[in-house]
Amino acid sequence: MATFKDACYYYKRINKLNHAVLKLGVNDTWRPSPPTKYKGWCLDCCQHTDLTYCRGCTMYHVCQWCSQYGRCFLDDEPHLLRMRTFKNEITKDDLKNLIDMYSTLFPMNQKIVCKFINNTKQHKCRNECMTQWYNHLLMPITLQSLSIELDGDVYYVFGYYDNMNSVNQTPFSFTNLIDMYDKLLLDDVNFVRMSFLPTSLQQEYAIRYFSKSRFISEQRKCVNDSHFSINVLENLHNPSFKVQITRNCSELLLGWNEACKLVKNVSAYFDMLKTSRIEFYSVSTRCRIFTQHKLKMASKLIKPNYITSNHRTSATEVHNCKWCSVNNSYTVWNDFRVKKIYDNIFSFLRALVKSNVNIGHRSSQEKIYEYVEDVLNVCDNEKWKTSIMKVFNCLEPVELDNVKYVLFNHEINWDVINVLVQSIGKVPQILTLKNVITIIQSIIYEWFDIRYMRNTPMVTFTIDKLRRLHTELKTAEYDSGISDVE
C-alpha cells in the first residue's frame, strides 16, 4: 500500500483542516475512469499504479481513483497537490514552509501515536506492531519530489513516493532537494518524530527516511507526444481541433511557492476554499511536440520512388502504383496541411532528381531513397539537415570555388514556384546545398513554422497565462485554412 495514501486516510480524521486538505479520491468511493497501461506515480496520492490522463493538462499523472476530483499540479486552488507543487527557483525558506506544512498535517507526538495504536489494537490480529498496520505512522518528512520542465519552467511535486525503482512511463523524474535545505536539520525533524514510535517501528521509519532522503537525483526527462492523452493524439489530424481542459481555481493571492503556508491559518484557508470554482478552456494544439508527431507519422508513409517517377499527379494523388501510391486511409492525411507539405516537397525533390540525369543509375536511386525518408522531420534539426545533405550529395553536385551546385531545370507545381520566389527571390536554374535547405524549410514553415512554436502545448500553461491568452482571444490561435505565413 502507498504510504502517503495511508497517511492521508488516517490523518484525515484528526481535525477539520485535515478532513478538507487530505481528502483523496483513492480513499473515497471508486468512480470508474478510462483505464490505461501507463505506469507511474499518481501525483495526487503518490502510489505507483496504472495512470490515466489529467483533465487539467492531458498528461498521464493521475490514477483512476484520484481522477474523480480532477486535480492538476497546475491548478490555482490550494488543494494538497497544488500546495506540494513548487516552481523554478526554490529557496531554503520555501522548503522550511513545506516541512512545516507536513508537520501540521501529519503531526507526530505521543498522543497521536497512542491514539492510532489503540485504534489498531482493537482487532485481535493486530496486537503486534507490524508495519502493515502502522504504515501511516511510517511516512517520514523528506524533500523527495517528481520534477518536470515545461517550456522553461521547472515544477517540483513533493511527496512520499514508494518503490522508486519501479517502471516510470511519465515525463516526471525523481529529484532530491535536500542539499538546498540542510541534511542535519531534516535529520533532526525526523529523529524527533521517530522517537515517539514504538522501538519495533523505529528501524523501519529510519530505513524509509534515509532511502528517500539520500538518493541521487535523476536526469530530467524530455516531454514528448507519448506523455499526452491518446484522445488528443488521435484528433491532431483535424486542423481546427481544440483541446478541452478544466482547471480548479480560487482567489489564491500568494506567490506560487507560498501556497503551503495556508495551512498555518485555518480560517484563511477555508475562506480561500469558498472562492473555489472550475474554469473551462478550449485551447489550440499548436506546438513543436504535436507537430513533430504529425510529421513523423507522415514520414512513416513516405514512398520515395515518386522522386524518380513520371507520374503527372501530385505525390498523394497517385493511385494504382505499387511503388508510389501513398496509403490515404491513415488519418494524418486528413490534415490538408500535411498533404500540402508532402506534395510540395516531393514535387521539388523530383525536379532536383530529374534535373540531374546522372541520378538515373539504380545504385544512386537506392541510396537517395534511404535518405528521403527523413526529409519531413524538420523538428529534429541535426538529423534533418544530415538527411538533406545526403540527398544533395546523391545528386553528384559540381564543385566550383569550394561551393557545390546542382542543376534545377525541371517542371514544378505552382506552390513550389511561389515558395522559390519568396525564399530565394526567383526561380533559379542552379542550387547550392544552402538553397535546398532553405527551400524545403520554407515549404514546411509555410504551414508549421516551428521557429515560433513553443515546445509543449497550451494545456501545460498555468492559470494566469491561460486567462491572459483567453482575454486576448489567443487560446485558439488559428482556424483551418490559415497558414503560419498568413
Curated annotation (Swiss-Prot):
Q: Region (Zinc-binding domain): which ranges?
A: 42-79
Motif extent (pLxIS motif): 480-483
Important for cytoskeleton localization, as annotated region: 82-176
UniProt region (RNA-binding), positions on chain: 1-81
The annotated region (Interaction with host IRF3) lies at 317-486
Q: Which parts of the sequence form the motif IKBKB-like degron (ILD) motif?
A: 479-483
Q: What is its main location?
A: host cell
In its keyword annotation, does this UniProt entry include RNA-binding?
A: yes
Please, one GO biological process term? symbiont-mediated suppression of host cytoplasmic pattern recognition receptor signaling pathway via inhibition of IRF7 activity
Taxonomic superkingdom:
Viruses
The record's subcellular location field reads: Host cytoplasm, Host cytoskeleton
Coiled-coil regions listed: none
Q: How is it modified after translation?
A: The C-terminal region is phosphorylated by host CKII/CSNK2A1. Phosphorylation of the DSGXS motif is essential for host NF-kappa-B inhibition.
Q: List, alphabetically, the InterPro entries matched.
A: Rotavirus_NSP1 (IPR002148)
Q: Does the keyword Disulfide bond apply?
A: no
Taken from the UniProt entry, a GO cellular component term is:
host cell cytoplasm
Q: Which UniProt keywords apply?
A: Host cytoplasm, Host cytoskeleton, Host-virus interaction, Inhibition of host innate immune response by virus, Inhibition of host IRF3 by virus, Inhibition of host IRF7 by virus, Inhibition of host NF-kappa-B by virus, Inhibition of host RLR pathway by virus, Interferon antiviral system evasion, Metal-binding, Phosphoprotein, RNA-binding, Viral immunoevasion
Q: Tell me, how does this one assemble?
A: Interacts (via C-terminus) with host IRF3; this interaction leads to IRF3 degradation. Interacts with host IRF7; this interaction leads to IRF7 degradation. Interacts with host CUL1 and CUL3. Interacts with host BTRC.
Family per UniProt?
A: Belongs to the rotavirus NSP1 family.
Let me see what the UniProt entry remarks about domains: The integrity of the zinc-binding domain in NSP1 is important for degradation of host IRF3. The pLxIS motif targets host IRF3 for degradation; however phosphorylation of NSP1 pLxIS motif is not required for its activity.
Q: What is the stated purpose of this protein?
A: Plays a role in the inhibition of host innate immunity by inducing the degradation of key host factors required to activate interferon production such as IRF3, IRF5 or IRF7. Associates with components of cullin RING ligases (CRLs) including CUL1 or CUL3, which are essential multisubunit ubiquitination complexes, to modulate their activities. Recognizes the host NF-kappa-B regulator BTRC through the presence of a DSGXS motif in the C-terminal substrate recognition domain.
Q: What is this protein called?
A: Non-structural protein 1
Species annotation:
Rotavirus A (strain RVA/Human/United States/Wa/1974/G1P1A[8])
